[in-house]
Amino acid sequence: MAQEGWSETWTFFEGQWHEGNVPLWGARTHAIWLGSSVFDGARAFEGVVPDLDLHCARVNASARTMFLNPTVSVEEWTGLVREGIAKFAA
């Protein structure tokens, strides 16, 4: 039986995958302090990830709109997302 309130979590940070809910942000983190973060709502289901390349492109476009310089290319994002999805049972 699954533990109530628990879900499998993987976090990509500093070039590697970490299992669990790794604490990444502190009170002085720019994204928290000044709201400088971007996100997009890509979803994976039934073995597909519709428009993943477009979702990843929007993340980088949103960063540029906020005068942030994306440090990960769309192709790298796409690969990381697929790598992360593979860590979960189908």
Question: Can you say where each PLM-predicted feature lies in the sequence?
Answer:
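Conserved alpha/beta cores of soluble small-molecule-handling proteins
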Residues: 1-90
